[in-house]
């Protein structure tokens, strides 16, 4: 995954301002060990650190205008980095950018994004960064959390909202959308791969008709590489 040395050493709590203004910051680490922070609501920008976050380079504009769609996705097979950018607060047209030089420069690229099993196109907004699967028959797959907005982020529409994921088996050219997360009213999610290849999915839920605390989150898992989700659980600790 890249050199560990920049990230080793004595643990310390350090507060460092990487960017000013706007929202939706996110951080990934590239295959070369570079830390890349992204953010933005008027245009999407990035800053790079090659020393584990001690110092940061100048701002790099990924898209202007642009609205940050969660974090980046690092392809651990090729080293390419993918950025999903919407034109404004979603639902909004989606643009995709790719970096082939460790986040130093970005180019807009065309992709094919397929709808989910309900025929709905996903939004990427307010979800965490994507990952590359490392285990099992789907090793090398790119996957990142996504969501369906049902028209807009309106409280009356929350019962129709749901999270899901998008994934690619051809290095980011074509993306399929997973089946919905098994609970409506969800959004703002993250996922991680476990050592046995199971994908753990954790999502906020704005709408909780059964009376559960809407401030807590819900979890599910996938054993088919992120195509379907099962074992829905109300999280008691997050």
Where are these regions (language model features)?
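Asp-box/BNR beta-propeller blade signature and adjacent active/binding-site loops
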Residues: 1-238
């Amino acid at each position: 995954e890249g050199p560990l040395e920049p990230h080793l050493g004595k643990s310390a709590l350090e507060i460092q301002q990487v960017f000013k203004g706007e929202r939706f910051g996110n951080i990934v680490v590239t295959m070369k060990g570079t830390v890349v922070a992204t953010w933005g609501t008027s245009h999407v920008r990035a800053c790079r650190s090659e020393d584990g976050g001690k110092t940061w380079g100048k701002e790099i504009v990924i898209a202007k205008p642009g609205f940050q769609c969660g974090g980046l996705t690092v392809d651990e097979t090729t080293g390419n980095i993918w950025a999903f950018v919407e034109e404004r607060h979603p639902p909004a047209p989606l643009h995709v950018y790719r970096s082939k030089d460790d986040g130093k420069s970005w180019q807009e690229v065309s992709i094919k994004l397929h709808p989910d099993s309900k025929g709905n196109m996903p939004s990427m907004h307010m979800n965490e960064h994507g990952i590359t699967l490392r285990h099992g028959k789907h090793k090398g797959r790119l996957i990142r959390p996504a969501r369906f907005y049902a028209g807009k982020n309106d409280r009356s529409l929350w019962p129709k909202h749901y999270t899901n994921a998008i994934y690619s088996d051809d290095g980011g050219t074509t993306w399929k959308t997973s089946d919905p997360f098994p609970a409506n009213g969800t959004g703002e999610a993250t996922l991680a791969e476990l050592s046995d290849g199971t994908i753990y999915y954790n999502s906020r839920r704005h709408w909780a008709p059964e009376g559960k605390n809407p401030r807590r989150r819900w979890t599910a898992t996938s054993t088919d590489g992120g195509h379907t989700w099962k074992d829905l659980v109300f999280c008691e600790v997050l």
